[in-house]
């Protein structure tokens, strides 16, 4: 069973992609989800409550849309997943998290998201479903 208390932030400039990621998370049992369409929104949402999100799921396209240093997303989340990471420069790691940090090139699929969330939330049991995927 998914931990219903996990706070998750999805950051993607494309609203339809954010909705697809949210749908994947819902299928895994997660519903405390916020979305951001820019890095500024992600930073504000991640820092305004005084405690970071448990998980940040962010598009590599969004990250390269603004100049940033390696600490620009510090304090936003405890764990992070970057999908479409092929857009990031080699060796550049914008995630400064204490927990799990994962980079995925290309589309985000349910199996990949389930594997990442299993590292973040080890007590959860995830169905082995296929079919939903994000496409660049």
How would you label these PLM feature ranges?
Residues 57-61:
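Active-site residues of response regulator receiver
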